[in-house]
Amino acid sequence: MLTASDVTGLLALPPSPLAARGEELTEEYSLDLDEATRLADQMIRDGVSAIGLCGTTGECATLLWDEKVALYSAVIDTVAGRVPVWCGTTALGTREVVREMRAVKDMGAAAAFVGLPLWQTPTMDNAVGFFADLAEAVPDLPVMVYANRFFFKFDFPVEFWARIAAEAPTVIATKVGFPLTQEHLDVAGKQVNFMTGEGTIGLQYRMAPESVTAAWATSAAMGPEPWVAFLGAHARGD
């Protein structure tokens, strides 16, 4: 099972390619799986280290579960173990998230990519308890916290990460969508890989270069080479 130290290189967060008439409400199926698998293969050949499916850009909030199953299965089969595949399982409630996590684990996902349930604004206890419940229910699947404070109506403060490190052992990484500070790294950096992305990786590098082992990029679908080069140079001490 992956740990925080295994999270290295560039995590690509591509869109989920739409079929020619996929936006039509009369269509029962919206995805172009041939393009999804072609894109996954191309990104691997261009140097990405992991692929994360069905984040925001990947239409996590709009695809049907049957469509996600087809997408995950097709991409995991195409990737064939060359890089880890992280599958989005954000949903409206914990029971559904657990069901989806168990399903993607059986498909061969390396980890789940999970945001807080999109319904009521969470308290601190709600937010921590949610990820603690996931660790108890699915103890053999790592979790990346989708920590976007605007989408999930929660600021992901230092206290949250201190409690996550103590109460949610399957959380190994986060897609940072909040102002990262040294204090976040101090309270949870050993368990959780704090991954910044396109707009903030330079800030993290200047603040705590030793903490930068990985980064995320939605723009990787247009060519990941700049981010692959940045992370490679950092790894070489260049």
Predicted regions and their residues:
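Catalytic alpha/beta core domains of metabolic enzymes, predominantly
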Residues: 136-142, 148-238
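Active-site beta->alpha loop and helix N-cap motifs at the rims of alpha/beta catalytic domains
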Residues: 2-153
